[in-house]
Curated annotation (Swiss-Prot):
Residue ranges crossing the lipid bilayer per the database entry: 14-34
Glycosylation sites per record: 202, 227, 374, 396, 475
Biological process (GO), any one: cell wall biogenesis
Record-listed E.C. numbers: 2.4.1.-
Protein's cellular compartments: Golgi apparatus, Golgi stack membrane
Organism: Arabidopsis thaliana
A Pfam cross-reference name: XG_FTase
Transmembrane as UniProt keyword: yes
PANTHER family: FUCOSYLTRANSFERASE 10-RELATED (PTHR31889:SF45), FUCOSYLTRANSFERASE 2-RELATED (PTHR31889)
Annotated keywords: Cell wall biogenesis/degradation, Glycoprotein, Glycosyltransferase, Golgi apparatus, Membrane, Signal-anchor, Transferase, Transmembrane, Transmembrane helix
UniProt tissue specificity: Expressed in roots, leaves, flowers and siliques.
High-level lineage: Eukaryota, Viridiplantae, Streptophyta, Embryophyta, Tracheophyta
Listed name of the protein: Probable fucosyltransferase 5
Amino acid sequence: MYQKFQISGKIVKTLGLKMKVLIAVSFGSLLFILSYSNNFNNKLLDATTKVDIKETEKPVDKLIGGLLTADFDEGSCLSRYHKYFLYRKPSPYKPSEYLVSKLRSYEMLHKRCGPDTEYYKEAIEKLSRDDASESNGECRYIVWVAGYGLGNRLLTLASVFLYALLTERIILVDNRKDVSDLLCEPFPGTSWLLPLDFPMLNYTYAWGYNKEYPRCYGTMSEKHSINSTSIPPHLYMHNLHDSRDSDKLFVCQKDQSLIDKVPWLIVQANVYFVPSLWFNPTFQTELVKLFPQKETVFHHLARYLFHPTNEVWDMVTDYYHAHLSKADERLGIQIRVFGKPDGRFKHVIDQVISCTQREKLLPEFATPEESKVNISKTPKLKSVLVASLYPEFSGNLTNMFSKRPSSTGEIVEVYQPSGERVQQTDKKSHDQKALAEMYLLSLTDNIVTSARSTFGYVSYSLGGLKPWLLYQPTNFTTPNPPCVRSKSMEPCYLTPPSHGCEADWGTNSGKILPFVRHCEDLIYGGLKLYDEF
């Protein structure tokens, strides 16, 4: 091969000067092309991260304190190892050594029992039996059934995975929706996607999982139709907003002693049920070791599990570098309007302005005298990222700050990536934009979110941010006070059980444990993990 590129000295001497130059240029170009080709993948990775000189000076911890494994090809999922570079500061919350060890053990278990393995095929065969009392087999599974909006899905995925981690089950994800278009595979050398030929997701049962389903655990428990002598091959766990306490308290010790023997669990959920796991003393012992800082549960699990696909990550990096990267400070504002607003947005805008100015997140508007005094050659730039279905919010904020100077002399620029007016769950492009915006919000320095919004919960917890929560308006009026600063970055379990397990049966669920208390953004109910007592 090398000889094909040699040119004898005799031939070169007979050539004219122009030909010599042409050959030299051609040969140099060839070497450049070969060099470029060999390094193309590396250059692609560098271009995607778009890291500036200041960012590269930060100590590199792509594995986030061991939370991530190095057993993946970077190019297949750029966000996995490159998210770190977009965050202005590394997260102060470090994963425990016990959590890191537990995740590595889980990865080996998933690889041994995942789809297309002999253990998986053996477990599938047992689904057709009427009774599973004879043997559990080596591998047990929990199937997450997709439903509801993206925020709900991510919260429930993290909840189900933590339950799988505690009970040594294999999590398999229903992929009939758009999971694979949004997220990369989280476990090396295997897949978390449930094969489409899984028998319990056929047309008959696809939308038949509800409280009336014959093997719904909550219903069977109420009817006393399940016991340790007759173990079904699968159970359906109903953990939605309309669940009964008999559904929600499947986490209790006495329930787990029976459920633990069932090979297959199928879960449909739209709530973040992690706080209730702490009601089980066995789980609590393990959870304390996994998460010494209790408010970091979703923060760590989300950074481990959720890695946007390259298509989604392109949206994040492009928008970030175009609008947010040069700002001195970034503020995220996520606004969810429940019900039909019918064009009535003024009370919401008033609430956002009242909250952000009262909490010094946005500057006050300057008086005529102040506008003359606060003249700076290098004014501070504050970028405000608005995430909402309605473009009116960013439009109103833009008009306010473009027409009236700020009292501090700061320049306030407002951006809103999308405003589609209608939530279009399961539409690929809509869900991809939603995921991109969650990540963009997580990159801000401070964040304000709407009460009861799972979109907001994911965003601030992913970024390790304690949010300002906007109280839900009533009768189209601005609440007073407009917002409250949360003492925890954990999401809220919006519809928890009313009481605790066994010994705590008669106790309000928000008063059982000092670190599991009611949420700040709900008048009644809701459970949340706190480190501050």
